[in-house]
Design a protein with these regions (language model features):
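Bacterial N-terminal signal peptides that target proteins for export
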Residues: 2-12
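The conserved beta1-alpha1 loop
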Residues: 136-140, 214, 246
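Gly/Ala-rich beta-loop-alpha elbow adjacent to hydrolase catalytic centers
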Residues: 213, 217, 221
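C-terminal motif of bacterial Sec signal peptides marking the signal peptidase cleavage site
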Residues: 21-24
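Short substrate-entry loop that stabilizes the transition state in hydrolases
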Residues: 143-148
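Lipolytic serine-hydrolase domain surface
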Residues: 26, 30-110, 121-123, 128-130, ...
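Short, low-complexity, Pro/Ser/Thr/Gly-rich segments in the mature regions of secreted, periplasmic
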Residues: 391-425
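Alpha/beta-hydrolase fold active-site loops
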Residues: 133
């Protein structure tokens, strides 16, 4: 395994301090899930279907706690977003006091419990866009119920994704000191997530399901898909794309999980960042085995294995993060949110047989090079590096058009775009 060097105690202490500073809800009031009843003029509204394995909280304004419930509870939750002039893409604006100011803060507009086995199906039918696509979000470690709801509302709003949005929130206590409890809670929630995905994919109103999971939620997601494949012999055909953002996954374990999905598995896209400090700590406390979300996809053995498995990797290392941990770039970066939304709105996967996501990024880089009239490296022109076979072909075609001199300059980058972890099955 690459780079299994022990982290100094001082560095670990620094990571813990940073996580403590960013983890909590220090300045947030308790009870943001209290419904306001109506959305204020000038705001935008995001309607979400929220399924959870959390236990109900005694406080109705909190709604659900970090403890484990006995079943799957489903709610329709509407969230209002402040006017564009009062916010930045990628930000969740928490109220500093209640009642929240809808012109400045995210506000819960309504919360409606959905009873019965088919309640979720009815909600999907009434909220299904023309694309007939569903996007399921699974949050990560150290998230409360409201964290998952507001974060996904922000992603849906900022990406302009043409989807019916579904949140699956599992029993995280929202504390950095409950890492092991949270991990066991993901295992506790596998059956429920598998059932939700199976029902969603079986809904005749749905044509396509994309799953986006973050951090520890990627473990839950891949485990649920693995369980589905073992139970049924395959993953549900409508589940075409799986996006793993900053995956807190042991690379060796992921290789085995991926192989268990079989040949007719979804296409996987992974967001990685070598400067992810949260994953650095996770790696340290997990036996110093590389975490999937922190690998360098341009080096071996990852390059060849990812390429053979047909996995697309977006390396966000050079992209500026929105927090000191660099663990939420996928949602906080306007560039990444836009890339996700543009592909989903077009009714395409993150990459497809005709256009690689890297082509859009590459076009920006190539345009900059042409404008400058000089040889500029793709890696310098854009902070997002894309690694997949289709992207490499697209870059090659563009490079030929730009001439051999440019080809010589960016050739090394082009060679790296095609990374490919697990062996192809």
């Amino acid at each position: 395994m690459i780079g299994k060097r022990r982290a100094p105690r001082a560095a670990l202490t620094g990571l813990l301090v940073a996580m403590m500073a960013l983890s909590g809800c220090g300045g947030r009031p308790v009870g943001v899930m209290q419904a306001a009843g109506t959305a204020a003029p000038g705001t935008s509204k995001v309607d979400l279907l929220v399924a959870t394995t959390r236990a109900a909280d005694d406080n109705p304004a909190v709604l659900f706690s970090g403890e484990r419930g006995t079943g799957l509870a489903v709610n329709a939750v509407d969230v209002s977003i402040p006017p564009e002039a009062n916010r930045k893409v990628g930000q969740v604006q928490w109220p500093s006091r209640l009642p929240a100011d809808p012109l400045r803060d995210f506000v819960t507009v309504s919360v409606d419990p959905l009873e019965g086995e088919r309640a979720g199906e009815t909600w999907l039918k009434s909220h299904m866009p023309k694309s007939r696509r569903v996007l399921v979000f699974v949050h990560g470690f150290n998230n409360r119920y409201e964290d998952a709801v507001y974060r996904f509302a922000q992603i849906v709003h900022d990406s302009h994704a043409d989807v019916a949005p579904v949140v699956f929130t599992w029993p995280s206590r929202g504390s950095i000191f409950d890492y092991n409890y949270d991990k066991e809670s993901t295992n506790y929630s596998r059956d429920a997530l598998e059932e939700l995905l199976t029902r969603t994919a079986a809904n005749p109103a749905v044509s396509d399901v994309t799953i986006m999971a973050h951090s520890m939620g990627t473990w839950l997601t891949v485990e649920a898909l693995r369980q589905m494949a073992i139970r049924n012999g395959h993953v549900a055909p409508k589940i075409n794309n799986v996006i793993l953002a900053s995956p807190d996954l042991d690379v060796d374990v992921f290789g085995r999980q991926f192989a268990s999905l079989g040949k007719d598995r979804p296409h996987f896209t992974i967001f990685v960042s070598q400067d992810d400090r949260a994953l650095a700590l996770s790696r340290r406390i997990s036996g110093n085995v590389d975490r999937l979300g922190q690998i360098d996809p341009s080096v071996e053995p990852y390059r060849s294995k990812l390429e053979a498995a047909g996995i697309t990797v977006l390396d966000l290392t050079k992209l500026k993060g929105g927090d000191r941990l660099n663990h939420g770039k996928f949602a906080e970066s306007p560039e990444v949110v836009k890339l996700i939304g543009d592909r989903l709105i077009a009714g395409q996967a993150i990459t497809d047989s005709n256009v690689g996501l890297g082509e859009a990024v590459g076009a920006v880089a190539m345009g900059a090079a042409q404008t400058a009239g000089s040889a500029v490296s793709v890696a310098v022109s854009t902070p997002i590096a894309i690694f997949d076979q289709r992207t490499r072909r697209n870059y090659d075609a563009q490079l030929k058009r730009l001439g051999q001199s440019m080809n010589n300059t960016v050739g090394s980058v082009g060679d790296s775009v095609g990374a490919g972890l697990p062996e192809s099955q």
